[in-house]
């Protein structure tokens, strides 16, 4: 644990395979301890700032519960809760918070912002999500897959279907490369990840005995998968023309029963970082249905509610894995 002490957690690419495996094993240990009532608080008297430029359910709750379980105090600063970027630079905010807090979580837009916080705060900074990356999510995704499939990480065939450029796709590809997984990214060519990231991940995968395949061929991409993973196709705030174009591009890549069957694996599981547009029972879901006639977007309700779906176990594991990151980088042993 000592080797991660005072480290920031900004992207999985900053960590070795052994370090990521350590965080996942620690997550298992902390989860087990919580379940059987033997958890020992290792963050006593630590003060943690949660800096959110984007609202969240799972990330905020996971950090707050994990910190509480471990004896830490938390201050939540929401989208209107600080002056960062408005009256105060990120560099200045970092130095202010670093003088008062032992650790800082950031969830927002730019990867450069979380990097600046880490550079100038003098305390561990944890990336709760940026437009480019989502490393804490991937720890939960991998832990869930191992728990359900009963396989070593390197033996898991992990497939992401959808927008290959988004933060979750980027983070999953990084994590899979580090862990030596067989990773398929199934997406339209127009939505491929950057060549720079893809080439870097392919090199890392080769070093760790893994493999990365990028394809727009759904049959080829999903065959043999242990995990089918998807994420939302569009984000609120994007212009209407982007929605229309994205929906047309991604409609064939909807995760449905036919796609799950194409894996040829009766034990395949479905993962999603949530929230999901699997029906029209939300305000945004209803707006999408009224405007585009689509009731189910990236995944059908049938798959989302099926036995193959492990999305709520995955959501719970956000808390256990985030706890592991905080304990490993800030804990007292």
Curated annotation (Swiss-Prot):
It catalyses: carbamoyl phosphate + L-ornithine = L-citrulline + phosphate + H(+). SUPFAM superfamilies: Aspartate/ornithine carbamoyltransferase (SSF53671). The keyword Transmembrane helix does not apply. L-ornithine binds at residues 167, 231, 235-236. Carbamoyl phosphate binds at residues 56-59, 83, 107, 134-137, 273-274, 318. It comes from the Bacteria. This is Ornithine carbamoyltransferase. It comes from Staphylococcus aureus (strain Mu50 / ATCC 700699).
């Amino acid at each position: 644990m000592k080797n991660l002490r005072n480290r920031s957690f900004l992207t999985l690419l900053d960590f070795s395979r052994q370090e990521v495996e350590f965080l996942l094993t620690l997550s298992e240990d902390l989860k087990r301890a919580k379940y059987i009532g033997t958890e020992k608080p290792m963050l006593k008297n630590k003060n943690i700032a949660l800096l959110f430029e984007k609202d969240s359910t799972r990330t905020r709750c996971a950090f707050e519960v994990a910190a509480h379980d471990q004896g830490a105090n938390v201050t939540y600063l929401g989208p209107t809760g600080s002056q960062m970027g408005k009256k105060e630079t990120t560099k200045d905010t970092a130095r202010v918070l670093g003088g008062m807090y032992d650790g800082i979580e950031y969830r927002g837009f730019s990867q450069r912002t979380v990097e600046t916080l880490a550079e100038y705060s003098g305390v561990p900074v944890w990336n709760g999500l940026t437009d480019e990356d989502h490393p804490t999510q991937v720890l939960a995704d991998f832990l869930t897959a191992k728990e359900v499939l009963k396989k070593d990480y390197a033996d898991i065939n992990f497939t992401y279907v959808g927008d290959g450029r988004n933060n979750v796709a980027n983070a999953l590809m990084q994590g899979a490369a580090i862990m030596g997984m067989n990773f398929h990214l199934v997406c339209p060519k127009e939505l491929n990840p950057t060549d720079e990231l893809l080439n870097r991940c392919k090199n890392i995968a080769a070093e760790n005995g893994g493999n990365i395949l990028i394809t727009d061929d759904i049959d080829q991409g999903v065959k043999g998968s242990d995990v089918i993973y998807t994420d939302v196709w569009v984000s609120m705030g994007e212009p209407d023309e982007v929605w229309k174009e994205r929906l047309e591009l991604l409609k064939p890549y909807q995760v449905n029963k036919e796609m799950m069957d194409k894996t040829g694996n009766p034990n395949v599981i479905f993962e999603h970082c949530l929230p999901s547009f699997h029906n029209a029972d939300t305000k945004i879901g209803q707006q999408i249905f009224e405007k585009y006639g689509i009731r189910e977007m990236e995944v059908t309700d049938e798959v989302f509610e099926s036995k193959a779906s492990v999305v709520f176990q995955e959501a719970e594991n956000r808390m256990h894995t985030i706890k592991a990151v905080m304990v490993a980088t800030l804990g007292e042993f």
